[in-house]
Amino acid sequence: MYLFFSNLSFNDICIITTTIPKMLMNVQSHDQSITYLGCLSQVYLIVNFGSIESCLLAVMAYDRYVAICHPLKYTVIMNHYFCVMLLLFACSLALHMCLFHILMVLILTFCTKTEIPHFFCELAHIIKLTCSDNFINYLLIYTVSVLFFGVHIVGIILSYIYTVSSVLRMSLLGGMYKAFSTCGSHLSVVSLFYGTGFGVHISSPLTDSPRKTVVASVMYTVVTQMHGPFIYSL
């Protein structure tokens, strides 16, 4: 579990450093411009680290399931080799995910001077500002995202269904409280990350007001990561 915590914390730092330093530099210099290559780099890194975050949250849900439902077999099932392989598999999935999205952005054409109503280059806003037809991009992005993140969400839900049913059968109140507190902190992060993330990408093509999507983006790229250590320490 601590291996996943450490990697999740490192990934959270990477997500924050992808967006906040550039935003602060823009505020200090009063220059809101960003190069095309720099914008693509932000899209790539955000999608990559966001995908890794999703994979890690799903893996941690499975880890909690094994720890609570099969405590005597935990060290056998979640051995170091298996945990490392899960992390490598998560990074590999995230890499393929972000490469797909970057390739889909590269085939689009943009005007010479385009204003992004956001504090960083977010994929949904970039596609919305293209000068070419973006229907295929939206269709493929939503299809792939639903399949990619949907599998993680279903896995998390199934893990917690079995976990909660196992906790409710516990006779000791102390063990039940400890199990619920551990699961509750993880579920809080999951709800905050997926809720705001899906809100941004679903509402972006449907609304003309960027303010709401910017607030949601701050929640899943900054607030979730900064509050993660505090939530897990409760």
Curated annotation (Swiss-Prot):
Tongue specific. GO terms for molecular function: G protein-coupled receptor activity; olfactory receptor activity. It is a multi-pass membrane protein. Disulfide bonds join 39-121. Keywords: Cell membrane, Disulfide bond, G-protein coupled receptor, Membrane, Receptor, Transducer, Transmembrane, Transmembrane helix. Residues 63-84, 161-182 are cytoplasmic. The chain crosses the membrane at residues 1-11, 43-62, 85-105, 139-160, 183-202, 213-234. Residues 12-42, 106-138, 203-212 are extracellular. GO terms for cellular component: plasma membrane. It comes from the Eukaryota. It is found in: Cell membrane. GO terms for biological process: signal transduction. Belongs to the G-protein coupled receptor 1 family. Possible taste receptor. This is Putative gustatory receptor clone PTE38.
